[in-house]
Structure formats: structure tokens, C-alpha cells
A protein has these predicted regions:
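N-terminal nucleophile
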Residues: 1-216
């Protein structure tokens, strides 16, 4: 995933935009993982994990974004897709050795706290997101990101986040909904949008498939 917007308060809201190669297979949200009962998310059919996991009974969600930095060794590398599943299920961020993972940002959110673990391939950085509306991108909590500068003020001012994703895809670096046709013919684009709302008595998960077909 490439973009996550979080709004704290009595109603915790998360919106994620998943950018990926259009030919990478996936399926929509469900309880796909017997090892994590009660956890819902879309599943990456290549690696088996997820980019956003929700545990409704625990009033908790976790989101995974690709990061920048030093890649893991190919001989020992493992998928990052299990990180959001484990975090949503256990309510804990990973401890210990992270060197088997490529760089990432992992957000763990509930009604009391929103935590961020950023791993650049060399050292982990742990922080809490501030109260209000924040935006996490592939460079983390980055106020200098073109996407953050373009869209964070709009999300802060808007009561209808869905309206902000109903725009034409663009190859612009600052666009929220993207579409890049690469020289080799492959398509890298925003494939789906997830909006999760967590309240003391209710959790909702809205999933929007942005693709007309899985081949782009």
C-alpha cells in the first residue's frame, strides 16, 4: 500500500489506497487466514498476506505500506504481508530482528492510540501519530511529500473523504489515485481503496475496487 490517511477521535477513521502492478493477483476482503481468526482483509495471492487488516471484535486495525531503504538479503527475505495480520490480531507491533523484511511502515490503530513502526532496513523507528488527521506515505510521516502537501489539507477540511478518491487517475507524482503505463507494457496503478471506521460499538469496512478488470 502507498497511502494511508488516519483521523483520530471518538470515531477512528482510516483510508488506505493500494497502488500495485495490475497483474499481481489478489482477492477482496474476507477472513482468509485460519491462523488469524476474526481478522478481515484483502489477500495478496502471490505472497499470501495483506496490506490492511481489521479485527472488528478487538476494535483494531493495522496497515502496511512499503518503505524506502536497504532491501533484505534475497536468501533470507520473507514477505511483509504477515506484519499487518499479526499486528491486528495481537495488538502488538513486532519486536526483535526485522532484517528479513524489506523496508516498511506499519500502522497499528485502536481507539486509544495510533502507533507507527518504520523500518528502513537498518533501524526501526517507533512513534505515535498525532491527534487529528495524518497521512502516511512510502516515505513515512513526510510533510515534504508531494502527495501529502497536495492532499492532507483537503482531508483535514473534508467531511466526505470518498469524494476525494473520485477523481481521474493520473501519472502525476502528487496524485492520490495513480495510473502509470510502463515502457514494458505493465500497468502500475491504484487498484483499491479501503475505508475503516472504528467506534466503541461498531466497526465498518468499505472496500472499493478501482479496476475495471484485473488485467488493467
Amino acid at each position: 500500500m502507498c497511502t494511508l490517511i488516519v483521523k483520530t477521535g471518538p470515531r477512528l477513521t482510516l483510508m488506505g489506497v493500494r497502488d500495485e502492478f495490475a497483474d499481481r493477483p489478489w482477492e477482496g476482503p474476507g477472513e482468509h487466514w485460519p491462523d488469524y481468526p476474526g481478522v478481515i482483509g484483502g489477500r495478496d495471492l502471490k505472497a499470501g498476506g495483506t496490506w490492511l487488516a481489521v479485527h472488528p471484535a478487538a476494535r483494531r486495525a493495522a496497515a502496511l505500506l512499503n518503505g524506502h531503504g536497504r532491501a533484505a538479503e534475497e536468501t533470507t527475505k520473507v514477505s511483509r504481508g504477515d506484519l499487518a495480520l499479526k499486528a491486528a490480531y495481537t495488538g502488538e507491533l513486532p519486536e526483535g530482528d526485522l532484517t528479513r523484511y524489506d523496508p516498511f511502515h506499519l500502522v497499528l490503530a485502536d481507539l486509544t492510540r495510533v502507533r507507527l513502526l518504520s523500518w528502513d532496513g537498518e533501524r526501526p523507528v517507533r512513534s505515535d501519530l498525532p491527534a487529528g488527521t495524518s497521512m502516511v506515505v512510502n516515505s513515512g510521516l513526510d510533510d515534504e511529500s508531494e502527495r501529502v502537501r497536495a492532499y492532507l489539507p483537503r482531508f483535514r477540511d473534508s467531511d466526505d473523504w470518498r469524494a476525494l478518491i473520485e477523481e481521474e487517475p493520473s501519472a502525476d507524482r502528487g496524485a492520490l489515485i495513480i495510473r502509470h503505463e510502463l515502457p514494458d507494457g505493465r500497468l502500475f496503478a491504484s487498484l483499491s481503496v479501503m475505508e475503516v471506521a472504528i467506534e466503541p460499538g461498531e466497526v465498518t469496512y468499505e472496500f472499493t475496487d478501482l479496476t475495471a478488470d484485473r488485467d488493467g
